[in-house]
Amino acid sequence: MRQHESYKCNVCGNIVELSHLGGGKLHCCGKEMECITTDLTSVVLMKAFAGESMARNKYEYFAKIAQKEGYRDIAEHFQRAANNEKMHAKLELKAYNVLNYDKEFGNTSENLQYAIDGESYENLTMYPDFSKVAKDEGHAEISKMLALIGKVEIEHENMYRMLKQRLDAGKEHVSDEEEEWICEECGHIHRGKKALKVCPVCKHPLEYQSRLNSKK
């Protein structure tokens, strides 16, 4: 038995993660539980990724607080550490992806699908469940907040679905109807069925041209 391994009861389906090492074996429903962890390295990589990601966010919040309180040097230290944690998280996610998918990251279409799946889980399962937990324990305001965040995730899912559909159809820079396209660098606006290959003002290429209505 190793810390962070997961064990499953083959009778009721209960799954537990071993958080502390101890003697003996795990039992449920009168039966010995089966270890279902086949790749502990992947498990600890994702735990490290989650921990570093949370630390990065916390340190950025702490930096803003220090800034507001007039402690600029402390704010800079918090922000520098946050940037370090971001890189740590990136390295851990890349290592996980290489172990499991033989590549560091997916392409944009694959990443959009990953985002769709994540947002769908959050709005259909995670936030409704978490909202209920808070409500059952008498935390009405927290329950409401979690439920409302879940509704935002629906919009995120819809946004990613639209972007993936457009990308997969080869219409990221073309449209069936006339639209306004804006240069991200200088703000030049062009109206037409496709974005300009080169901005006539600042000469930035196609990838800097995007639909103006998507910015509203």
Q: What function would you assign to each model-found segment?
A:
Residues N10-V11, H27-G30, E185, V201:
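Short, cysteine/histidine-rich loop/knuckle motifs that typically chelate Zn2+
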Residues M1-G13:
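Small, basic N-terminal interaction modules of short regulatory proteins
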Residues I15, S19-L21, T38-K216:
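Non-heme di-metal
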Residues L26-T38:
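Generic amphipathic, hydrophobic interface segment in small proteins and small subunits
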